[in-house]
């Protein structure tokens, strides 16, 4: 009897192992956690394995890229800024659902990162002060637009690297799609906003405030 039970358990374990090997696909939860870790650590080689950007609207990214080229922002400057924004990123997976037949999955995650609202507030104060100081300088001594942009970038990076900054936690549904038989994160605006500590929400609120003030 014991041998029969043992044989059944071994057989079941073998079948499960073969099934797992046959799929050759990491779960949606595994991909989500590994993708978030790659983003936090700014692992540029690993990011394409977990993130799918094919369905994203890249118009804004294109405009930012053109602006970066105009002021000659280096890859090092950009990497330093991104890493400062994601260095405190942490997460807790709440649940995961997969629908391989439909090619979709959803992982509910509690994301924690820096709260960008107070950081943006500090940045605007310092940027305004710098701009005013520049405008008061004599002709020929005023910094160029490129120099001012570099200064703003450094100011924001320094603010993000402060210790003791506030954090915010947001629960979001992280969507994934099957790409060549593997799950990949296809972030929507809510996910991006949570990853960036509410930066998109803060920007929209600021834009609305400026529009109301100008009306």
Labelled PLM ranges:
Residues 1-12:
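Positively charged n-region of N-terminal signal peptides that target proteins for export
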Residues 17-20:
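C-terminal motif of bacterial Sec signal peptides marking the signal peptidase cleavage site
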Residues 23-94, 118:
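Core segments of small alpha/beta cavity-forming domains
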Residues 101-113:
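A short hydrophobic beta-strand element
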Residues 111-117, 178-180:
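Beta-strand elements of well-folded, non-transmembrane domains
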Residues 127-147, 164-207:
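Short beta-strand edge/turn micro-motifs at domain boundaries
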Residues 150-166:
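Acidic, glycine-rich flexible loop segments
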Residues 213-215:
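Short, solvent-exposed mixed-charge patches
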